[in-house]
């Protein structure tokens, strides 16, 4: 069985990293794309008036491939801590983990629709990104709760 202190220490560092990921991810998204779907669309589709070149399929693929590995590994590592907690039910754990993976996949793939001039994918990108960040925040909150639940019980 895992010692309570060791679990709490590991969870503390994981929570700190999730928090850092949330803040830096939001900051980078806003800096790079902006807040509005129209800004996201212009970033990927390009705008000659503002000298913004359109992104290519190959360029998006070069970005997507490392994101697949990084994001899936991040979700796996943090969700793995969730499996050791008893704060929420198994069904809610399944829903949270599934929703994280689905929102990440949609976030990664939505620029492909934008470069082929489907403006709806700019909205999809924004919604998927904010959903992913919100769900990571929920995961952070649940793990934070689990830290106190576990230590108060032991």
Where are the regions a protein language model picked out?
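Alpha-helical transmembrane segments of multi-pass integral membrane proteins
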Residues: 108-154
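Membrane-interface helix-boundary signature
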Residues: 3-10, 54-57, 89-96, 115-125
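Hydrophobic alpha-helical membrane segments
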Residues: 95-111
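Cytoplasmic juxtamembrane regions at transmembrane-helix boundaries
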Residues: 77-100
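N-terminal signal-anchor transmembrane alpha helix
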Residues: 5-35
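Perimembrane loop-to-helix junctions flanking transmembrane segments
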Residues: 38-55
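Individual transmembrane alpha-helix segments
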Residues: 54-77
